[in-house]
Amino acid sequence: MVAEDERRVPAAVVFDALGLDYEKAFASSGAHRASLRWLLERLAPGSRVLDVGCGTGRPTAAALADAGHRVLGVDVSPVMVELAARQVPGAEFRRADIRELPLEDGSFDAACAYFSLLQMDRAEQEAVVGRLARAVRPGGFAVLATVPVDIEGAEGLFMGQPVRVTSFGADAFKDVAVRAGLAVLAQEHAEFAPAHPEAVPEPHLFLHCRRPAR
């Protein structure tokens, strides 16, 4: 018989286990908050925003909802979705896999994916970035963040949890965004040390993009 954990999406298993520890470990990321400020400065009042891999809802969904925007947060982890709904009552949250979630073209003013693609393979990451680019209306924004390291299917521990990680180098990840039809308006690099005894410092890359207007 297949164990329950083996039938579930690996990312869901990892983040169910981490819960609020993940939020605490990354709460001090100034680069993440600066990225959110970049987006907030450009959104029209009451914008509809998709938050992919919403986690506990903080800081992304919370910052957007507090500013009066209509936020849909999605995550494969039921624990994270429950925490987010409790912590950010002004947003909507769904347990869903962004690879399969139906998305209408141009149905959002902006989309965010902060470090939520790393447990997908490269083809899946490219496909998801393409889906987000299409889901954002022409003239809308997309913010993508990753750990810009050229690795594929690397197994290791993340905050004590076993993970299998795939990522792109910085230039290659930017190329993914461009191939999806996004214009990269700005990119920011940062080094961040999560506040967790089993975490190690990691490079972060933030791409601030726009879907060109027709």
Task: Enumerate the language-model features and the residues they cover.
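Conserved class I S-adenosyl-L-methionine
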Residues: 2-45, 150
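Class I SAM-dependent methyltransferase SAM/SAH-binding core
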Residues: 50, 56-100
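A short acidic, Gly/Pro-enriched loop at the edge of an enzyme's catalytic core
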Residues: 99-111
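A short glycine-rich, Lys/Arg-flanked "PGG" loop and its adjoining helix->strand segment in the class I
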Residues: 126-138
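Conserved beta-strand signature within the Rossmann-like core of class I S-adenosyl-L-methionine
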Residues: 139-146
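Short, glycine-/aromatic-enriched active-site segment of Class I SAM-dependent methyltransferases
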Residues: 147-164
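Short alpha-helix
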Residues: 165-181
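Core SAM-dependent methyltransferase catalytic element
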Residues: 193-214
